[in-house]
């Protein structure tokens, strides 16, 4: 099965989506931490919302980058499911790296427990899967390929 919609540029392959969306989520997180403090962010579970949005942004960005690589002939994929698995694999990689970074930067903090790490990872993965589902099922004629 060949990739069907490679010739049509999907919305997630635009530079503002690829670059600005992940940076925007990161900046929103930092602004909220600055304004309300890390204790308030964790007690009100706002960090889970931010991790979910981060999962959406990483999923869209990695899909956009992979689409550009395919359209230039750098990467050749014959199946759109392989495309989806690559995007999901990159999402998993980023989620794990982000939690390692949080551990390194904030280790002595009382808020970064094992349960918090797992909930952050789950929220990031759910956000990414939600983005894939929305693009595949809800937005007509828009695929991750």
Predicted segment positions?
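Bulky hydrophobic segments
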Residues: 1-118, 122-145
């Amino acid at each position: 099965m060949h990739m069907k919609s490679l010739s049509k540029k999907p919305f997630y392959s635009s530079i503002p989506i690829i670059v600005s969306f992940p940076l925007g989520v990161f900046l929103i997180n930092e602004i909220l931490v600055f304004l309300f403090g890390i204790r308030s962010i964790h007690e009100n579970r706002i960090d889970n919302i931010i991790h979910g949005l981060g999962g959406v942004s990483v999923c869209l960005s990695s899909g956009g980058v992979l689409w550009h690589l395919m359209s230039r002939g750098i990467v050749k994929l014959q199946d759109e499911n392989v495309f989806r698995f690559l995007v999901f694999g990159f999402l998993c990689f980023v989620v794990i790296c982000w939690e390692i970074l949080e551990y390194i930067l904030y280790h002595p903090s009382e808020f970064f427990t094992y349960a918090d790490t797992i909930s952050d990872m789950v929220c990031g993965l759910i956000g990414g899967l939600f983005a894939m589902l929305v693009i595949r099922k809800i937005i007509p004629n828009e695929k991750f390929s």
